[in-house]
Amino acid sequence: MAEKRDYYEVLEVTKESTVEEIKKAYRKKAIQYHPDKNPGDKEAEEKFKEAAEAYDVLSNPDKRARYDQFGHAGMSGAAGNGGPFGGFSGGMSMDDIFSMFGDIFGGHSGGGFGGGFGGFGGFGGGGSQQRKFRGSDLRVKVKLNLKEISTGVEKKFKLKKYVPCSHCHGTGAEGNSGSETCPTCKGSGSVIRNQQTILGTMQTRTTCPTCNGEGKIIKDKCKVCGGEGIEYGEEVVTVKIPAGVAEGMQLSMGGKGNAGKHNGIPGDLLILVEEEPHPELIRDENDLVYNLLLSFPTAAIGGAVEIPTIDGKVKVKIEAGTQPGKVLRLRGKGLPSVNGYGTGDLLVNVSVYVPETLSKEEKSTLEKLEESKNFKPSTSIKEKIFKKFRSLFD
């Protein structure tokens, strides 16, 4: 499958573009690739859906912030791979797109741009504003340890949610009674109201109060769901968490939220990532940090020590004369980037342990060593340490 394009590139806007500029850019793309203008052109249809997906993210402040920070992985859980978070366009019909972006298409419901598109009309008539109900989003939390974050992991969730009614299959109607065209709006989902003003008669189009914008009414309502088309149930969902996710990151799994009334558009499942603290390692973005406490003899004469990593312990050589504050870098032993670009390092911060109590023999030995010039810091060492200390205040 082709890799997803950058959403800003799709709409030909920049990260500094305002919501209004993004809306204008999307409107331009929607007109260019609209199915009515490009009948039978599959490539144009895909570009139309691609533009709609980009607009869905960039026009929403929360989604846009996640996308700016994490890229496609923040929206799809597996950057551009069409996985379980494959974005809304993969499972959305053209009618769904028109329904979600009614303010752009002037209430289109599948039969051309319609008269409500203002100065962008002319691709068919209708002015229909039939509405599809969208289910609400569901939110869950997932707690991950560093090992799971480093490799990616699948998690199963047992969700209590609204699902299509098992009796009426989501229609809301009892048996085969079905639905009837709304007598108020004649199926358009909207009504035009005339209002007298000092400038003359003003016409406004509003949602039909009888059918609530659906364009149809149910005479014989389902006995199980009461005509809503949904009931409370359960669903087990498997979520593939990508490697490199971070605390506070929110993933979105399209279409796995609450079902929409009357076979409407389902909401999304939003997964908030929480990170379990590691007993020895601290995370710093994609790097991991470990505080190594060396004994004085090992720091002085050198040796080998074991360092914990995500994949187990590794032996690291300690050079003779290793100073406190030195940082050893184990490349590639950190966490992968959630966007798939590179892996962090494991930074080993060296500290030297000074014993609090000594035996007589140990104290005597150290007193003898104290007289040695090698145990007295030279002027150059003092200057080096002072420069490092002063840099903390620059």
Swiss-Prot record:
Zn(2+) 2 binds at C182, C185, C208, C211. Binds 2 Zn(2+) ions per monomer. The keyword Hydrolase does not apply. It comes from the Bacteria. Residues 6-71 form the J domain. One of its GO terms (cellular component) is cytoplasm. InterPro entries: DnaJ, DnaJ_C, DnaJ_domain, DnaJ_domain_CS, HSP40/DnaJ_pept-bd, HSP_DnaJ_Cys-rich_dom, HSP_DnaJ_Cys-rich_dom_sf, J_dom_sf. One of its GO terms (molecular function) is ATP binding. GO terms for biological process: chaperone cofactor-dependent protein refolding; DNA replication; protein refolding; response to heat. A zinc finger (CR-type) spans 152-234. Keywords: Chaperone, Cytoplasm, DNA replication, Metal-binding, Repeat, Stress response, Zinc, Zinc-finger. CXXCXGXG motif repeats lie at residues 165-172, 182-189, 208-215, 222-229. It is found in: Cytoplasm. PROSITE patterns: DNAJ_1 (PS00636), DNAJ_2 (PS50076), ZF_CR (PS51188). Its cofactor is Zn(2+). Zn(2+) 1 binds at C165, C168, C222, C225. The J domain is necessary and sufficient to stimulate DnaK ATPase activity. Zinc center 1 plays an important role in the autonomous, DnaK-independent chaperone activity of DnaJ. Zinc center 2 is essential for interaction with DnaK and for DnaJ activity. Homodimer. Participates actively in the response to hyperosmotic and heat shock by preventing the aggregation of stress-denatured proteins and by disaggregating proteins, also in an autonomous, DnaK-independent fashion. Unfolded proteins bind initially to DnaJ; upon interaction with the DnaJ-bound protein, DnaK hydrolyzes its bound ATP, resulting in the formation of a stable complex. GrpE releases ADP from DnaK; ATP binding to DnaK triggers the release of the substrate protein, thus completing the reaction cycle. Belongs to the DnaJ family. This is Chaperone protein DnaJ. It comes from Bacteroides fragilis (strain ATCC 25285 / DSM 2151 / CCUG 4856 / JCM 11019 / LMG 10263 / NCTC 9343 / Onslow / VPI 2553 / EN-2). The lineage of its organism: Bacteria, Pseudomonadati, Bacteroidota, Bacteroidia, Bacteroidales. The gene is dnaJ.
